[in-house]
A protein has these predicted regions:
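Short regulatory helix/loop adjacent to the ATP-binding pocket of P-loop NTPases
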Residues: 58-68
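Conserved D-loop-proximal element of ABC-family nucleotide-binding domains
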Residues: 26-29, 33
């Protein structure tokens, strides 16, 4: 209600540009659609600059009034490409519409891939979420086996990808195991071309890095502390088992807090079962922040 009054006040002022800062972040989903409607209704005669990290609002605005906005990615990090970076129509389409993203992965992406193996690994978490969505448990389980650092199984990612998307764009056979992912050199990844899909290119590099870090932490902790993964298969369980809660062991507490607090080790950065938005993690963290967190995690693992 209070936001509606603020929008009504904004409608009455003589200024043509209205700035809204993350208008739906603190609201339940039941109100989000109403807020999007109110923004369009009250501010239809003005220009609006809406700042948000929530793609739900972007989708709601698009569905209520098609092609009503230009989308930008805002960045302000030393050493990076900064300012308001326009998201082109190609990426706007696949960000807003899951069917367009699936269509891209089944055909158009073929001309953009620079490294097939890296592409397949980077998209593995999304593939698993897609399998969960369409209830293909066999392929979901096969992907799960290569997404945990302590596992030894391997799977043919080429055939799995082609079968899932009913395509033949992956030409070479890539049989991948967890050890293959852990052995990958992740500095200076180049997965797809950046001219047509720059945000997707960034996203896939991030996705690969998140997966690599999670798996590396799992592998190190399971091996070093001889953890039985039968009942401790998830990363948070492994961390708690490696560093059990003890008032007498402050080092354990520090290590546990360190790993549990790292953003890139959260499930949300690797799991798409509840949200098929492949872009959200990459929108939430800058390249520099990811690089710093990667260095911190690997340094901590090396000190154990």
């Amino acid at each position: 209600m209070s936001l509606s009054f603020e929008l009504l006040k904004a409608k009455k002022v003589d200024k043509q540009l209205i700035v809204l800062d993350d208008p739906i972040s603190s609201f339940d989903s039941i109100y989000k659609n109403k807020i999007a409607y109110a923004i369009i209704k009250f501010l239809s005669d003005k220009y609006s600059l809406i700042l948000t990290h929530n793609t739900d609002l972007i989708k709601l605005l698009e569905h209520q009034l098609n092609n009503s906005f230009t989308l930008y990615y805002m960045n302000n990090t030393e050493g990076e490409n900064n300012g308001f970076l326009k998201i082109n129509d190609n990426e706007k389409r696949i960000l807003l519409y899951i069917p367009s993203l699936i269509k891209l992965f089944s055909s158009e992406i073929a001309h953009e891939i620079l490294n097939e193996k890296a592409f397949l690994i980077s998209i593995a978490p999304f593939l698993r979420g897609y399998c969960y969505l369409i209830q293909n448990n066999e392929k979901k389980d096969a992907l799960t086996k290569i997404m945990h650092g302590y596992e030894t199984a391997s799977t043919n990612l080429s055939s799995l990808y082609n079968e899932l998307f009913q395509t033949d764009i992956i030409k070479n056979e890539h049989i991948i195991s967890a050890s293959d992912i852990l052995a990958y050199h992740i500095d200076n990844l180049d997965i797809i071309k950046k001219d047509k899909f720059p945000l997707l290119a960034k996203t896939l590099i991030h996705s690969f890095t998140y997966l690599y870090l999670r798996m590396t932490v799992e592998k190190k902790l399971v091996d070093k502390y001889r953890i039985d993964t039968t009942n401790n298969c998830m990363l948070n369980q492994i961390i708690n088992k490696a560093f059990p809660n003890s008032k007498k062991d402050l080092e354990n507490t520090k290590n546990r807090i360190f790993f549990l607090s790292k953003k890139t080790l959260l499930n949300e950065f690797n799991h798409f079962e509840m949200d098929m938005n492949i872009f959200q993690p990459a929108i939430d963290i800058t390249n520099k922040a990811l690089e710093n967190e990667k260095d911190e995690i690997l340094k901590k693992l090396g000190s154990l």
